[in-house]
Amino acid sequence: MLIVTPKQMGRIEDRSEKLGVSKKQLMENAGKALAGAIDEYCRKDISIPEEEKSIVFLAGKGNNGGDCFAAANILVYRGYKITIINVGGQPSTELAKEMFLRLPKERIEFIDGYRSESVEAAIEAAELDYMTIPQPKELDDLARKKDRNPLDNILLQEKRRMSLVKSAIICAYVVVDGVYGTGFRDQLDKNIAGIFAIGTSAYRIAVDVPSGGNSFTGTVAFGAFEADETVTFGFMKTGMTQYPMRKYCGKMTVADIGIPAGALDVLDSDRKYYRIERNHLASFPPRRERDAYKGTFGNVLVIAGSSSMRGAAALAALGALRSGAGLVKVASVEKCIDTLSVLVPEATYLEMDCDDYGFMLFDSSKDALQKAMDSATAIVIGCGMGVTPDTMEITRFVLANAKCPVVVDADGINCIASDIDILLGKRSDVVITPHVGEMARLLNCENSMIRNNRIVAAEKYAEKYGITVVLKGAGTLIANGRMTASNHTGNAGMAVGGCGDILAGIIGSIIAQGCSVYDSACAGVYIHGLAGDAAAQKLGMESMLPRDIVDCLSDSFRLLKEKHGKKA
């Protein structure tokens, strides 16, 4: 599925207008789509008549407010009770003004939800918020107060307004957020955050994106609107694939608003963004012909493990084997191999000399390692390997001499963190699979910098070094400098040590079987998450282990084959 940045969406709309589909038509279509989603939800409960289902629109002053007005104009004629709270003040764009003027004012309740700067100052001084609004009797008592000063009058008026706003939202069947759109980048106004915080059992729908969310990065401001459903127009926005904004979107509905196909031409020279779907994996797994042999499906060399971290090597090897690799060889130390030969008898082994602490040595194993590298069609390095001068040298040697693609994970990433420019001298394609902490070490920055700019971090690093970056986490990103994909499979049960080792093995296996490096990374991430979802369904997120993900890889491949009509 194609996704776009906010800037790309703006250019697409501009191009649509030149192709004969005006922005007014796009807004009208957006209004129809929004009204359709609201109507669909409301009609699920037939025990309550339409006229008793109150729909409250929180309308901003920009085009998101215009979308609300367009939808309200449809729904009011379907019998719903419509209330519009103008949270951002009067409409400020020409399109929003036009949609507002079309509304049948006599059939709609309007509530002033806007607060001026002078009123804002008075409210702050009085420490008044939506959680402490006086009850009607208290308001009457204040109104009868004889010695009111000008500030008292402001507060009384504001308390009445806030009471109306709160009452409308509490009594609503559906609350629609159309305050801010894709251009939001700041902090939420306290008045607006207070309105969003009003407790209600209503179904909450966001227009295009939830207000308070950064639709490019996926970060959210304090007090952002948390929706049950987001109706986004034309295309999903990049920030909607990333947490925490993805959580704030709820169910995501992508509405067709009539953008002509030719409008996408403006993206021809742009970096492309996608959400990985099953149809992207139509070429994988490859068909297994009856006359195939083990060499047909690639040879994966896994350089991993140490005396104290044997499981990482085992999981990487199992991930590769369960993903269809014909041959898997593990290069590791003796104690690790002794364990793996029992856990993974299907693999072959290259014993590396080790130091007194059980980590691999380089010089004495260099020739044997080079020979193993020469016969491999993909290399996975780093899982449980440790960070020592020798493992750092091994990593540098592999990157400089490998003739096949290399997947660098875990300690392999940590081994190059102090000398990242070694990637500029790589001999073949490279995939790195960092989590946020490892990415921060690579870029020498705080973890928060990566969390708040995941897309930019992955793209810039991939572009600078000419590699594929798999930035792990909820909404894993796969970037190669020209394309960036996001993944939506997987779950919180996978937040446990060992899952990343399996992923590295899966990606290495798919590369070894002949898929392109970028496509292999995308497929590997998707399949890994799909297996995690299968494990969670069987065992629950709390009880599943990484080994269960390995066992469920067969479920992933079965689902892919069923989707594409392939024979097992």
Label every PLM stretch briefly.
Residues G36-V179, D189-V207:
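Nucleotide and nucleotide-moiety/phosphate-recognizing core
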Residues M1-K97, A121, L128, I170, ...:
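Small-residue (G/A/S/T)-rich helix-start motifs and N-terminal tracts that mark the onset
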Residues Y173-V174, V179-S269:
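Internal gly/pro-rich beta-alpha loop/helix module
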